[in-house]
């Protein structure tokens, strides 16, 4: 099992996503799985930023034989940054989602099985149709 930790500020969404992308590449996560995890990470980091742009977030990416887990830890008041909309990338493309508030930390974990059949392209196309 390989694991990488990133400490960053949620106000730097693009920079944080670049760090996560680099971590997923270093962990040899497939392109399709990386795209889904990055889409989910973008939603989550944006939600954290909207709630507390001045705080910090620790992101951990961990790969096992079964898939990849990305965990977001944010200090502060109870706040679950997981998108609730059923058409969100996180809800549609992640195989497991868990949240806990422990010791003043909001911890959200998303897991995607290796080569999951949950296709991010379908979610992107669905969102484009809704926007029109």
Describe the residue ranges of each PLM region.
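Conserved beta-strand-loop-beta-strand hairpin that lines the nucleotide-binding pocket
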Residues: 1-2, 47-132
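Conserved ATP-binding N-box helix of the HATPase_c
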Residues: 29-56
